[in-house]
Amino acid sequence: MNIYITGLGSGYEVEHLVRLFYPMAPLTLTPPEDGADCVWAEKRPDKLWAMVRQGGKSRTVEAPLPIPVEEGGETPEFALASLTYDLLRSWTGIRPPWGKMTGVRPVRLVHDKRAAGWTEEEIDDFFLKRFDCSPEKYGMAKAIADLQEPILKMGSAPKTYSLYIGIPFCPSRCSYCSFVSCNLDRDRKLVQPYVDCLCREVEAIRDEADKAGLMLCSIYIGGGTPTSLSAAQLRQLMGTVRDCFDLSAIVEYTVEAGRPDCTDAEKLAVIREYGATRISINPQTFSDEVLENIGRKHSAQDILDCYAEARAAGHDDINMDLIAGLPGDTVEGFEKSLRQAIALDPENITVHTLTLKRASRIVIEDQKENDYADVAAMLEKCHLLAEAGYRPYYLYRQKNTLQNLENVGWCKPGHEGYYNIYIMEEVQTILSAGAGGSTKLVADGGKRMQRIFNFKYPTEYIQRFDEVLERKKGVAVFYDHDLGTETSG
């Protein structure tokens, strides 16, 4: 299946709406050959036209050109995208649960519309009628927006910020992963020089934040796999963080403990000793077969043992990640994993939907309708979380997620992950340290924003570290109301 769009400036919306039904279909720049499977969308001088052809059968639809936007109409691109969406919904029998929405932050839309003075009825119509969003998905987004409001008010106070520290090393690469990470065995010689530079960057961030008069709100050490560092390296890094910042003044300090094959009792004790208030242990699944399919080098029992060690070390706010749609998993298998996670009684359970990234090892062709039903049925099992006392507190979506579904963080009341909310709703400055780090500066209630990028790969980050420090000086400059220029590596 190919996508061909003509007559529009970009066709971005049409392209991504087609991928709600055919996730991996490529966009072509030339008309499809006669008889070839395709979705063809076209803005003609006198009308809008769309066709789907598959397996020797085809269907076409057309509509008048929309009236101009300034007269209350739609843009030609949105009108053509809607026409194509209706065609493919009828052709495939699939109703995407988020309807025509291709954006990754539906909860942010609720916040934005409320801030703009829209009534609740107008917001309802926007989601349910204009975008054909299902009542269930919209209801979840709206409930999450309600829960987030007091947290966002605190996090969006002037000159508050969160600190992200990235560890781009893993013991092995999971087949679904597209993040830049280095194999620990192959690149072990980089780890200590990287940690040394990282500590210096944390100190530089402290200095720049102080110059700008910023107040630290939360800390998140992620990856990669932060516990791929040795216990001594964790002490070095977290000791630097403790020396630089008043940890008693922040609302949250998270460390991704991640995988049990590189997390042990000593590292868990270090994480607790140096001030972390929240950790994440991420099984993804409790099926040994599925763990092997995705390239994990540990068993489900190892996850249980790691969780027990974390509790023994005194960790009292634990998140566990699961992924719906992993290779070889089933609805029954996913439900079993979900029940196992609930039985462990962590404070947070985050349910992700598998995302098809070109940089990952998983290569999946167009999803069949039964695949759609399986992944959707997996997420329907999340009612078990609500029944166990968890509630959804943040939600986001990614491009090329199976069947346009979502990732949702569930928590027990009072255990919302603040950093997750702040970064998803984009209300707060995030200062990032480490390879691949993306600092996002926010001021004037979100009216001014600027990004500062670190070099992507650890080797380049280490070799050009002086440039990393020089770029961080842009933080204080930004808050002096001199925007400067966006810099990237």
Place the predicted regions along the sequence by residue.
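Radical SAM enzyme core and accessory elements
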Residues: 1-108, 112-116, 120, 198, ...
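N-terminal [4Fe-4S]-dependent radical SAM core
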Residues: 91-95, 115-163
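Key residue(s) within conserved catalytic/signature motifs
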Residues: 143-144, 176, 255
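Conserved non-cysteine loop/helix-boundary elements of the Radical SAM core domain that shape
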Residues: 181-380
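Amphipathic, soluble alpha/beta structural segments
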Residues: 214-215, 219-223, 401-407, 470-489
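A structural motif corresponding to the C-terminal lobe/cap of the Radical SAM core domain
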Residues: 304-317, 326-459
